[in-house]
Amino acid sequence: MADQVYFEDVEVGAEIPSLVKEPDSLQLVQWAAGSGDFYQIHYDPAFAKRNGLEGPIVHGALKHAFLGELLHQWVAPGGRIKRVACSYRGMDLPNRRLTHKGKITKKYQEGARNIVELEIWAEDANGKTTTPGSAVVTLPSRA
């Protein structure tokens, strides 16, 4: 985890540090067990291919969790994640790099709260955005 980020130090348009993940088949099975999502397209190559896929695909909700981890690593320990939303626009295969990124789109104060809005997304190994989203976080003040 990096040093604490403060509200006064962030600027609209700035990107936050990225998070790289390369989920493998074991992580997909572990996610299935934890989430209860045992749909075979996430772990059975033959089933995935019979359903028109190249092979098993990463759970969308796992990519959502990675985006949450990206935000947590950026705001912690003193900031808080208030909202995370994303949509699943592309299928990602296991054992391939996923890079999770964020860009500050707005910052403002609401009462005593220091609010930062971000565009967030996951990119596949080719740089294609497969999971676009948005987030709202609060950051501590230096004051």
Where are the model-predicted features located?
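Residues that form or immediately flank small-molecule/cofactor binding pockets and catalytic motifs
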Residues: 21, 91, 109
